[in-house]
Design a protein with these regions (language model features):
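Active-site-proximal cap/lid insertion segments
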Residues: 1-146, 151-154, 158-177
């Protein structure tokens, strides 16, 4: 789940900019249920700064973006990274390195968010893969791999940019693969 904090040993894999954009990333939802168009799980408009490893600016909604959850206790202050409009410019700051990224193109900014999300998500999931691998290796080492059943369960996975989404609110085929 959010916020995809990966172990430092994974910082050099799945670099932003190397992950292919899904063909449905800019889905307009024309042939989908109304819920698909109304869903609040769009990479371009619904991710918070922490999701992307970015510094959240201080201030109100005009400066820092809309709260992720309105009407919730004041302790939860996560703000959505704004969706860039065609006549705007935005600068965001990497929380890890302090690097500034400036955008004036909404499409490029949405793709930047996708790359940041995917990089962080895949690095985090790599730890799960490695952990399961260690269990299987231990079973081999102990010589009990042939008479041991390993059952791994989870709910459906996150969308990885398909239809422009992150999260797992819909059970579309992509979130099961």
């Amino acid at each position: 789940h959010r916020n995809w904090q990966y172990h430092p040993r994974y910082k050099d894999i799945h670099k932003p900019g190397t992950i292919p954009l899904p063909g449905t990333f800019e889905d307009k939802y024309d042939n989908r249920a109304a819920a698909a168009a109304a869903a609040k799980m769009r990479i371009k408009s619904d991710m918070v700064y922490e999701d992307l490893g970015l510094v959240q600016p201080e201030g109100g909604a005009d400066l820092a973006g809309q709260r992720m959850l309105n009407g919730v206790s004041d302790w939860y202050q996560a703000r959505k990274v704004p969706e860039l409009k065609s006549d705007e410019t935005i600068t965001v700051i990497c929380a890890e390195t302090g690097e500034n990224f400036t955008f004036d193109d909404p499409k490029a900014f949405a793709e930047f968010k996708y790359q940041r999300y995917m990089s962080r998500y895949l690095r985090t999931v790599q730890a799960v893969d490695d952990g399961v691998g260690k269990i299987l290796d231990t079973l081999d080492t102990l010589g009990i791999n042939q008479n041991t059943i390993v059952i791994y369960t989870s709910d459906q996975g996150f969308f990885l940019g398909e239809h422009g989404w992150f999260d797992k609110r819909f059970m579309y085929e992509e979130s099961f693969q």
